[in-house]
Protein backbone atom coordinates (compact mmCIF):
# COMPACT_ATOMS: atom_id res chain seq x y z
CA UNK A 1 0.00 0.00 0.00
CA UNK A 2 1.67 3.16 -1.20
CA UNK A 3 3.27 5.66 1.17
CA UNK A 4 1.34 4.50 4.24
CA UNK A 5 3.98 6.04 6.47
CA UNK A 6 2.84 9.59 5.69
CA UNK A 7 -0.58 9.06 7.30
CA UNK A 8 -0.56 9.80 10.99
CA UNK A 9 0.68 12.15 13.65
CA UNK A 10 3.12 14.98 13.21
CA UNK A 11 6.23 12.91 13.85
CA UNK A 12 5.25 10.52 11.09
CA UNK A 13 4.60 13.38 8.69
CA UNK A 14 7.35 15.93 9.04
CA UNK A 15 10.17 13.68 10.19
CA UNK A 16 9.39 10.19 8.95
CA UNK A 17 8.63 11.30 5.41
CA UNK A 18 11.83 13.28 5.10
CA UNK A 19 13.94 10.43 6.47
CA UNK A 20 12.49 8.06 3.90
CA UNK A 21 13.17 10.45 1.05
CA UNK A 22 16.68 11.24 2.20
CA UNK A 23 17.42 7.52 2.13
CA UNK A 24 16.01 7.24 -1.38
CA UNK A 25 18.35 9.99 -2.48
CA UNK A 26 21.55 8.70 -0.92
CA UNK A 27 21.30 4.98 -1.70
CA UNK A 28 23.88 4.15 -4.41
CA UNK A 29 22.63 4.17 -7.97
CA UNK A 30 22.96 0.42 -8.43
CA UNK A 31 19.54 0.10 -10.06
CA UNK A 32 20.07 2.87 -12.55
CA UNK A 33 20.99 1.95 -16.08
CA UNK A 34 20.01 -1.68 -15.60
CA UNK A 35 16.26 -1.55 -16.11
CA UNK A 36 15.69 0.80 -18.98
CA UNK A 37 17.32 4.17 -18.23
CA UNK A 38 18.33 5.74 -21.53
CA UNK A 39 22.02 6.23 -22.26
CA UNK A 40 23.57 9.51 -21.20
CA UNK A 41 23.53 12.01 -24.07
CA UNK A 42 27.27 12.35 -23.68
CA UNK A 43 30.14 14.79 -23.38
CA UNK A 44 32.77 15.56 -25.97
CA UNK A 45 35.69 17.32 -24.31
CA UNK A 46 37.45 17.99 -27.60
CA UNK A 47 34.52 20.08 -28.86
CA UNK A 48 33.70 21.63 -25.49
CA UNK A 49 30.36 19.81 -25.36
CA UNK A 50 28.89 19.05 -21.96
CA UNK A 51 25.45 17.78 -20.94
CA UNK A 52 23.37 19.08 -18.04
CA UNK A 53 20.09 17.36 -17.12
CA UNK A 54 17.04 19.30 -15.91
CA UNK A 55 14.24 17.52 -14.01
CA UNK A 56 11.13 19.63 -13.47
CA UNK A 57 8.00 19.22 -11.38
CA UNK A 58 5.14 21.68 -11.14
CA UNK A 59 2.06 22.26 -8.99
CA UNK A 60 3.09 19.74 -6.34
CA UNK A 61 0.71 21.41 -3.87
CA UNK A 62 2.09 19.69 -0.79
CA UNK A 63 1.24 16.16 -1.93
CA UNK A 64 3.82 14.59 0.34
CA UNK A 65 2.21 11.18 -0.13
CA UNK A 66 3.99 11.16 -3.51
CA UNK A 67 7.27 12.44 -2.14
CA UNK A 68 9.03 9.08 -2.37
CA UNK A 69 7.93 8.72 -6.00
CA UNK A 70 9.54 12.06 -6.77
CA UNK A 71 12.63 11.29 -4.73
CA UNK A 72 13.12 8.11 -6.73
CA UNK A 73 12.53 9.91 -10.03
CA UNK A 74 15.03 12.65 -9.18
CA UNK A 75 17.54 9.99 -8.15
CA UNK A 76 17.12 8.05 -11.38
CA UNK A 77 17.40 11.29 -13.36
CA UNK A 78 20.67 12.01 -11.59
CA UNK A 79 21.96 8.51 -12.24
CA UNK A 80 21.34 9.13 -15.95
CA UNK A 81 23.93 11.94 -15.77
CA UNK A 82 25.63 11.51 -12.38
CA UNK A 83 26.23 14.72 -10.50
CA UNK A 84 24.97 16.84 -13.39
CA UNK A 85 21.19 16.90 -12.79
CA UNK A 86 19.37 20.00 -11.54
CA UNK A 87 15.90 19.51 -9.97
CA UNK A 88 13.53 22.48 -10.36
CA UNK A 89 9.93 23.46 -9.65
CA UNK A 90 7.67 25.68 -11.74
CA UNK A 91 5.69 26.93 -8.75
CA UNK A 92 2.82 25.98 -6.44
CA UNK A 93 5.18 23.67 -4.59
CA UNK A 94 3.12 24.54 -1.51
CA UNK A 95 -0.39 25.86 -0.93
CA UNK A 96 -3.69 24.25 -1.80
CA UNK A 97 -2.23 21.26 0.03
CA UNK A 98 -3.81 18.15 1.59
CA UNK A 99 -4.19 18.03 5.36
CA UNK A 100 -0.93 16.20 6.11
CA UNK A 101 1.11 19.13 4.80
CA UNK A 102 -1.34 21.99 5.34
CA UNK A 103 -1.72 21.27 9.06
CA UNK A 104 1.99 22.07 9.46
CA UNK A 105 1.80 25.13 7.15
CA UNK A 106 3.55 23.07 4.46
CA UNK A 107 6.79 22.74 6.40
CA UNK A 108 6.80 18.97 5.65
CA UNK A 109 6.82 19.81 1.94
CA UNK A 110 9.65 22.30 2.35
CA UNK A 111 11.64 19.71 4.30
CA UNK A 112 10.89 17.18 1.59
CA UNK A 113 12.07 19.54 -1.15
CA UNK A 114 15.32 20.03 0.73
CA UNK A 115 15.75 16.25 0.87
CA UNK A 116 15.23 16.08 -2.90
CA UNK A 117 17.96 18.68 -3.41
CA UNK A 118 15.46 21.14 -4.90
CA UNK A 119 17.01 24.63 -4.76
CA UNK A 120 15.21 26.50 -7.57
CA UNK A 121 11.53 27.33 -8.03
CA UNK A 122 9.35 29.84 -9.77
CA UNK A 123 6.87 31.58 -7.49
CA UNK A 124 3.33 30.28 -8.00
CA UNK A 125 0.10 31.93 -6.94
CA UNK A 126 -0.49 29.33 -4.20
CA UNK A 127 2.79 30.22 -2.53
CA UNK A 128 0.86 33.33 -1.43
CA UNK A 129 -2.08 31.45 0.13
CA UNK A 130 -1.19 32.69 3.62
CA UNK A 131 -0.23 36.12 2.35
CA UNK A 132 2.79 37.64 0.63
CA UNK A 133 4.48 38.42 3.94
CA UNK A 134 4.16 34.81 5.12
CA UNK A 135 5.62 33.58 1.84
CA UNK A 136 8.58 35.93 1.99
CA UNK A 137 9.36 35.59 5.68
CA UNK A 138 8.72 31.87 6.16
CA UNK A 139 8.49 29.87 2.92
CA UNK A 140 11.15 31.87 1.07
CA UNK A 141 13.38 32.14 4.11
CA UNK A 142 16.90 31.22 2.95
CA UNK A 143 17.06 28.46 5.57
CA UNK A 144 14.70 26.42 3.37
CA UNK A 145 17.36 26.39 0.66
CA UNK A 146 15.27 27.45 -2.36
CA UNK A 147 15.95 30.36 -4.72
CA UNK A 148 12.46 31.69 -5.51
CA UNK A 149 12.20 33.43 -8.89
CA UNK A 150 9.67 36.03 -10.06
CA UNK A 151 11.08 38.41 -12.65
CA UNK A 152 7.77 40.20 -13.22
CA UNK A 153 7.44 41.35 -9.60
CA UNK A 154 8.59 44.95 -9.29
CA UNK A 155 12.24 45.65 -8.55
CA UNK A 156 11.19 47.76 -5.56
CA UNK A 157 9.30 44.81 -4.10
CA UNK A 158 12.41 42.62 -4.38
CA UNK A 159 14.65 45.21 -2.74
CA UNK A 160 15.93 44.57 0.81
CA UNK A 161 13.00 46.60 2.17
CA UNK A 162 10.37 45.10 -0.14
CA UNK A 163 7.64 42.59 0.60
CA UNK A 164 9.45 40.05 -1.63
CA UNK A 165 12.98 40.70 -0.41
CA UNK A 166 13.85 36.98 -0.61
CA UNK A 167 12.78 36.73 -4.27
CA UNK A 168 15.00 37.35 -7.29
CA UNK A 169 14.71 37.54 -11.07
CA UNK A 170 17.17 34.76 -11.82
CA UNK A 171 19.78 32.44 -10.43
CA UNK A 172 22.77 30.62 -11.94
CA UNK A 173 24.09 27.11 -11.36
CA UNK A 174 27.43 25.86 -12.67
CA UNK A 175 27.15 22.15 -13.43
CA UNK A 176 29.49 19.95 -15.50
CA UNK A 177 31.50 23.04 -16.39
CA UNK A 178 28.49 24.86 -17.86
CA UNK A 179 26.66 27.85 -16.41
CA UNK A 180 22.87 27.51 -16.48
CA UNK A 181 20.75 30.59 -15.87
CA UNK A 182 17.22 30.17 -14.53
CA UNK A 183 14.60 32.91 -14.78
CA UNK A 184 11.13 32.64 -13.28
CA UNK A 185 7.83 34.49 -13.64
CA UNK A 186 4.27 34.32 -12.33
CA UNK A 187 1.04 34.29 -14.32
CA UNK A 188 -0.27 37.66 -15.50
CA UNK A 189 -3.70 36.51 -14.29
CA UNK A 190 -2.78 36.64 -10.60
CA UNK A 191 -5.68 39.00 -9.91
CA UNK A 192 -8.16 36.35 -11.03
CA UNK A 193 -6.85 33.68 -8.66
CA UNK A 194 -5.75 35.70 -5.62
CA UNK A 195 -7.29 38.26 -3.30
CA UNK A 196 -6.94 41.98 -4.07
CA UNK A 197 -4.59 42.31 -1.08
CA UNK A 198 -2.30 39.56 -2.33
CA UNK A 199 -2.37 41.00 -5.84
CA UNK A 200 -1.36 44.44 -4.52
CA UNK A 201 1.34 43.04 -2.25
CA UNK A 202 2.87 40.91 -5.03
CA UNK A 203 3.12 44.02 -7.22
CA UNK A 204 3.57 42.43 -10.64
CA UNK A 205 4.51 45.35 -12.88
CA UNK A 206 5.58 43.64 -16.11
CA UNK A 207 4.09 41.05 -18.42
CA UNK A 208 5.54 37.66 -17.49
CA UNK A 209 6.88 36.88 -20.96
CA UNK A 210 8.41 40.35 -21.29
CA UNK A 211 10.16 39.92 -17.94
CA UNK A 212 11.52 36.52 -18.95
CA UNK A 213 12.77 37.88 -22.27
CA UNK A 214 14.38 40.87 -20.57
CA UNK A 215 16.25 38.84 -17.96
CA UNK A 216 17.22 36.08 -20.41
CA UNK A 217 18.63 38.67 -22.79
CA UNK A 218 20.65 40.26 -19.99
CA UNK A 219 22.04 36.88 -18.95
CA UNK A 220 22.97 35.81 -22.46
CA UNK A 221 24.47 39.12 -23.58
CA UNK A 222 26.51 39.47 -20.41
CA UNK A 223 28.24 36.18 -21.21
CA UNK A 224 27.54 35.01 -17.66
CA UNK A 225 25.64 31.90 -18.76
CA UNK A 226 25.86 29.21 -21.42
CA UNK A 227 22.14 28.31 -21.40
CA UNK A 228 18.90 29.80 -20.05
CA UNK A 229 15.97 27.86 -18.58
CA UNK A 230 12.65 29.67 -18.05
CA UNK A 231 10.24 28.64 -15.29
CA UNK A 232 6.86 30.24 -16.00
CA UNK A 233 3.98 29.59 -13.61
CA UNK A 234 1.34 29.90 -16.30
CA UNK A 235 -0.22 27.63 -18.89
CA UNK A 236 2.08 26.45 -21.68
CA UNK A 237 0.22 28.66 -24.16
CA UNK A 238 1.40 31.74 -22.24
CA UNK A 239 5.02 30.98 -23.19
CA UNK A 240 4.49 31.30 -26.94
CA UNK A 241 6.13 34.74 -27.21
CA UNK A 242 9.31 33.85 -25.34
CA UNK A 243 12.29 34.77 -27.50
CA UNK A 244 15.49 33.18 -28.70
CA UNK A 245 17.54 33.87 -25.56
CA UNK A 246 15.70 31.07 -23.73
CA UNK A 247 16.71 27.47 -24.50
CA UNK A 248 13.93 25.53 -22.75
CA UNK A 249 10.73 26.54 -20.96
CA UNK A 250 8.87 24.78 -18.15
CA UNK A 251 5.32 25.91 -17.40
CA UNK A 252 2.55 25.05 -14.95
CA UNK A 253 -0.57 26.43 -13.24
CA UNK A 254 -3.14 24.60 -15.38
CA UNK A 255 -2.25 21.11 -14.06
CA UNK A 256 -1.99 19.79 -17.61
CA UNK A 257 0.54 17.76 -19.58
CA UNK A 258 1.46 19.86 -22.58
CA UNK A 259 4.18 20.59 -25.10
CA UNK A 260 4.80 23.52 -27.39
CA UNK A 261 7.43 25.70 -29.00
CA UNK A 262 8.30 29.33 -28.30
CA UNK A 263 8.64 32.05 -30.91
CA UNK A 264 12.39 31.66 -30.43
CA UNK A 265 12.25 27.92 -31.17
CA UNK A 266 12.67 26.56 -27.64
CA UNK A 267 10.62 23.58 -26.48
CA UNK A 268 7.92 24.13 -23.85
CA UNK A 269 6.94 21.46 -21.31
CA UNK A 270 4.16 21.36 -18.74
CA UNK A 271 4.40 18.43 -16.33
CA UNK A 272 0.96 17.94 -14.79
CA UNK A 273 0.48 18.28 -11.04
CA UNK A 274 0.47 16.71 -7.57
CA UNK A 275 3.79 14.88 -8.06
CA UNK A 276 2.42 12.51 -10.68
CA UNK A 277 4.70 13.66 -13.50
CA UNK A 278 8.18 14.98 -14.18
CA UNK A 279 9.71 16.58 -17.27
CA UNK A 280 13.31 15.49 -17.86
CA UNK A 281 15.56 16.98 -20.53
CA UNK A 282 19.24 17.04 -21.39
CA UNK A 283 20.78 20.37 -22.33
CA UNK A 284 23.64 19.48 -24.65
CA UNK A 285 25.83 22.57 -24.63
CA UNK A 286 28.78 23.32 -26.91
CA UNK A 287 30.94 26.36 -26.35
CA UNK A 288 30.52 29.07 -23.77
CA UNK A 289 28.85 32.38 -23.16
CA UNK A 290 27.46 34.26 -26.14
CA UNK A 291 28.96 31.69 -28.52
CA UNK A 292 27.37 28.68 -26.84
CA UNK A 293 24.93 26.48 -28.73
CA UNK A 294 22.31 24.43 -26.91
CA UNK A 295 20.44 21.34 -28.05
CA UNK A 296 17.56 19.98 -25.95
CA UNK A 297 16.95 16.22 -25.85
CA UNK A 298 14.04 14.50 -24.09
CA UNK A 299 15.06 11.81 -21.60
CA UNK A 300 13.13 8.57 -21.12
CA UNK A 301 14.37 7.37 -17.74
CA UNK A 302 12.86 3.89 -17.82
CA UNK A 303 13.17 2.33 -14.35
CA UNK A 304 9.42 2.15 -13.84
CA UNK A 305 8.58 5.62 -15.15
CA UNK A 306 5.77 5.65 -17.70
CA UNK A 307 5.20 7.47 -20.96
CA UNK A 308 2.63 10.24 -21.33
CA UNK A 309 1.16 11.87 -24.41
CA UNK A 310 4.14 14.26 -24.39
CA UNK A 311 7.67 13.04 -25.05
CA UNK A 312 9.92 14.19 -22.25
CA UNK A 313 7.14 14.30 -19.64
CA UNK A 314 7.15 11.09 -17.62
CA UNK A 315 4.66 9.45 -15.29
CA UNK A 316 6.22 8.86 -11.86
CA UNK A 317 3.14 8.09 -9.74
CA UNK A 318 3.75 4.85 -7.83
CA UNK A 319 7.39 4.75 -8.88
CA UNK A 320 8.58 3.90 -5.37
CA UNK A 321 6.61 0.63 -5.56
CA UNK A 322 8.25 -0.47 -8.82
CA UNK A 323 10.31 -3.68 -8.40
CA UNK A 324 13.47 -1.91 -9.52
CA UNK A 325 13.11 0.51 -6.62
CA UNK A 326 11.93 -1.96 -3.95
CA UNK A 327 15.37 -2.28 -2.37
CA UNK A 328 15.74 1.48 -2.15
CA UNK A 329 12.41 2.01 -0.44
CA UNK A 330 12.61 -0.97 1.92
CA UNK A 331 16.03 0.26 3.01
CA UNK A 332 14.45 3.63 3.76
CA UNK A 333 11.59 2.11 5.75
CA UNK A 334 13.78 0.91 8.61
CA UNK A 335 15.45 4.30 9.00
CA UNK A 336 12.04 5.98 8.77
CA UNK A 337 10.77 3.87 11.69
CA UNK A 338 13.85 4.68 13.76
CA UNK A 339 13.47 8.42 13.21
CA UNK A 340 9.73 8.34 13.94
CA UNK A 341 10.23 6.46 17.20
CA UNK A 342 12.87 8.98 18.27
CA UNK A 343 10.45 11.93 18.08
Task: Name these PLM-found stretches.
Residues 5-7, 117, 149, 329:
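Short linear interaction motif-like sites in intrinsically disordered regions of transcription factors
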Residues 36-307:
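Acidic, metal/ion-coordinating pockets
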